């Protein structure tokens, strides 16, 4: 699995805004949207393209389009914040959904939604979730995708924790690459990333007050 940490001043500035506990929900959302576009741009670097002739107002030129646009799969809830940024970069991408909540006692993922194409064979998949902490949610989602034939999965996360990265590397699953803005060193006793940025879902949308 390739691990790609995007080193860029604009990436760092948006990540700083997201980390800052003073950032309000709207400021956090705006920074996440900007950072999401940057990470999707980087994740798309290896997508295959077809060439075709295009007529400019002056002459002919070579045109380029994606051979197979990826399917964007957010892990709900926080992953929803990355859908619009991804679609702004790849407007012809299809979107699937995986809903997972975190059991605050066990820190294990609790699935509650799955809306995916039946056959993902041969299709690039961008699995998006702002946070990679223990890796439990991401691994659960990857197994769902693999069960439908996905064999080219790119995980796009804003912040990854070293324990989650190691869990992803150790899993025998079809993960091609991880694209992230940073790898933080550890998790606390509540399995939150340290230093991290808190609960991305809460900072996007407010506290979740429904037990699943």
From Swiss-Prot:
CDD domains: PRTases_typeI (cd06223). It catalyses: UMP + diphosphate = 5-phospho-alpha-D-ribose 1-diphosphate + uracil. 5-phospho-alpha-D-ribose 1-diphosphate binds at residues 77, 102, 129-137, 199. Pathway: Pyrimidine metabolism; UMP biosynthesis via salvage pathway; UMP from uracil: step 1/1. Allosterically activated by GTP. Its EC number is 2.4.2.9. SUPFAM superfamilies: PRTase-like (SSF53271). Belongs to the UPRTase family. HAMAP family: Upp_B. This is Uracil phosphoribosyltransferase. It comes from Corynebacterium kroppenstedtii (strain DSM 44385 / JCM 11950 / CIP 105744 / CCUG 35717). The lineage of its organism: Bacteria, Bacillati, Actinomycetota, Actinomycetes, Mycobacteriales. The gene is upp.
């Amino acid at each position: 699995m390739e691990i790609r940490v995007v080193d860029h001043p604009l990436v760092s500035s948006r990540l700083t805004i997201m980390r800052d506990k003073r950032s309000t929900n709207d400021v956090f959302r705006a920074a996440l949207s900007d950072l999401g576009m940057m990470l999707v741009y980087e994740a798309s670097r290896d997508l295959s393209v077809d060439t075709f002739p295009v007529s400019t107002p002056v002459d002919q030129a070579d045109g380029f389009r994606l051979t197979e646009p990826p399917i964007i799969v957010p892990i709900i809830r926080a992953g929803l914040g990355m859908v619009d940024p991804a679609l702004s970069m790849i407007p012809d991408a299809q979107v699937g959904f995986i809903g997972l909540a975190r059991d605050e006692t066990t820190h294990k993922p609790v699935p509650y939604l799955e809306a995916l194409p039946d056959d993902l064979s041969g299709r690039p998949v961008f699995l998006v979730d702002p946070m990679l902490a223990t890796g439990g949610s991401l691994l659960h989602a990857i197994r769902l995708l693999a069960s439908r034939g996905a064999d080219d999965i790119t995980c796009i996360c804003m912040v990854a924790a070293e324990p989650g990265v190691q869990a992803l590397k150790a899993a025998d699953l079809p993960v091609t690459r991880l694209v992230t803005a940073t790898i933080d060193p550890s998790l606390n006793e509540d399995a939150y990333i340290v230093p991290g940025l808190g609960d991305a879902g809460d900072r996007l949308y407010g506290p979740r007050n429904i037990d699943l």
